[in-house]
């Protein structure tokens, strides 16, 4: 694989197990000349154990139109909404609070997301999760 030249990196967020050729996946991959159905089948097979989770994926397209992809952990905001069973954050986060996040929940989210964050210490990851929660209008205990 080292002799193949990378021609494009495509970053998308796709629900786990639900990739289909409709926008935004189809146009993004079609412009790069990638087999769209081939990607959808591979992605759905790889993420069938995580249905409904919004998963960031980085697709590497090579000069011979082959591809590889890496799935990452869901965004922190999605993990927070899932932990608190929310549809969305507050429209006015500094005034309207929509929930409370405990330190145990913050730690669990930080541990899950830490490998995708550029941090070494768990405390740094927890501070990032707390900041995201505050920007969504969620109090952190």
UniProtKB/Swiss-Prot annotation:
Family to which this protein belongs: Belongs to the universal ribosomal protein uL11 family.
GO terms classed as biological process: translation
Subunit structure: Part of the ribosomal stalk of the 50S ribosomal subunit. Interacts with L10 and the large rRNA to form the base of the stalk. L10 forms an elongated spine to which L12 dimers bind in a sequential fashion forming a multimeric L10(L12)X complex.
Protein known as: Large ribosomal subunit protein uL11
GO molecular function, one term: large ribosomal subunit rRNA binding
GO cellular component: cytosolic large ribosomal subunit
Pfam short name (any one): Ribosomal_L11
CDD domains the UniProt entry points to: Ribosomal_L11
Task of the protein: Forms part of the ribosomal stalk which helps the ribosome interact with GTP-bound translation factors.
Post-translational modification: One or more lysine residues are methylated.
Source superkingdom: Bacteria
Gene name for this UniProt entry: rplK
Keywords: Methylation, Ribonucleoprotein, Ribosomal protein, RNA-binding, rRNA-binding
